[in-house]
């Protein structure tokens, strides 16, 4: 029998659209953009299963719930990938690479893959705790998902030998992604628009700096010509007298 540990009191500690099963199970399932798969995952033996749409606050909430339960050692990514957010790929990048000093998920391709409320320590705990990420992205086949859960259960290494890691996210268990002061989920179309707006903003900033340089260069050129004419007239005046 694999060793088990008590999860954080009141686990799951962060609210969400998940279904909860046996907290001693070693498997967590993220159904990404798909709904209706959760109960089947729980029936197959998962500790927690639910969708995740956003590559920032959504991922933060999943990480918070996983690392507050030391028993969860496998993450299964299944269901339809979220267009624009590309949440499944962002999860994989987070597990494989971690985050940078700016909170950005290294190697993530989503529109806004930045974690503002989860620090490096928490991310490294997540990476240590999860021994395998099973990639079933874009798979909604209950049979295949159930088989993956069973395979993970058969390889249960036991709980990580660390206490539950508790993250205090804004809104806590009583709040959601719509709470004031918290990043709000956006549609894939809006994510793409925001990404393009950032690119446009950067281009405008560059063009502004270029315009300032050109204006300075032009003004300097005019001043140089005026100074040259003044000196020429001065010299001619001296020579004439």
Curated annotation (Swiss-Prot):
Q: Which UniProt keywords apply?
A: Cell membrane, Cobalt, Membrane, Methanogenesis, Methyltransferase, One-carbon metabolism, Transferase, Translocase, Transmembrane, Transmembrane helix
Q: Which GO terms describe its biological process?
A: methanogenesis, from carbon dioxide; methylation; one-carbon metabolic process
InterPro entries referenced in this protein's UniProt entry, alphabetically: MeTrfase_MtrA/MtxA, MtrA
List the membrane topology term(s).
Single-pass membrane protein
- According to the UniProt record, what class of enzyme is this? translocase
The pathway this protein participates in, as annotated, is:
One-carbon metabolism; methanogenesis from CO(2); methyl-coenzyme M from 5,10-methylene-5,6,7,8-tetrahydromethanopterin: step 2/2
One GO molecular-function entry: tetrahydromethanopterin S-methyltransferase activity
Cytoplasmic side of the membrane: what ranges? 1-220
Q: Which residues bind 5-hydroxybenzimidazolylcob(I)amide?
A: 85
Q: Which cofactor does it need?
A: 5-hydroxybenzimidazolylcob(I)amide
Q: Main site of residence?
A: membrane
Subunit annotation: The complex is composed of 8 subunits; MtrA, MtrB, MtrC, MtrD, MtrE, MtrF, MtrG and MtrH.
Protein family (similarity comment): Belongs to the MtrA family.
Annotated protein name in UniProt: Tetrahydromethanopterin S-methyltransferase subunit A
Organism of provenance: Methanocaldococcus jannaschii (strain ATCC 43067 / DSM 2661 / JAL-1 / JCM 10045 / NBRC 100440)
């Amino acid at each position: 029998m694999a060793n088990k540990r008590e999860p954080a009191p009141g686990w799951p500690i962060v609210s969400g659209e998940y279904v909860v099963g046996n907290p001693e199970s070693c498997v967590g399932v993220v159904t990404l953009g798909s709904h209706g798969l959760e109960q089947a995952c729980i029936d197959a033996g998962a500790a927690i299963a639910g969708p995740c749409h956003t590559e920032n606050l959504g991922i933060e909430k999943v990480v918070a719930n996983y690392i507050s339960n030391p028993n969860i050692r496998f993450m299964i990514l299944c269901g339809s990938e979220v267009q624009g957010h590309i949440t499944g790929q962002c999860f994989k990048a987070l597990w494989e690479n971690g985050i940078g000093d700016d909170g950005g998920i290294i190697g993530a391709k989503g529109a806004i893959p930045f974690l503002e409320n989860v620090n490096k320590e928490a991310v490294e705990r997540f990476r240590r705790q999860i021994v395998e990420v099973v990639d079933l992205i874009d798979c909604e086949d209950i049979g295949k998902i159930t088989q993956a859960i069973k395979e993970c259960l058969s390889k249960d290494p036991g709980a990580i030998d660390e206490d539950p890691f508790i993250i205090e996210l804004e809104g806590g268990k009583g709040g959601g992604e719509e709470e004031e002061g918290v990043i709000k989920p956006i549609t894939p179309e809006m994510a793409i628009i925001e990404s393009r707006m950032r690119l446009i903003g950067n281009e405008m900033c560059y063009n502004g700096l270029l315009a300032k340089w050109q204006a300075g260069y032009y003004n300097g050129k005019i001043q140089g010509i005026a100074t040259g004419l003044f000196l020429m007239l001065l010299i001619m005046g001296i020579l004439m007298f």
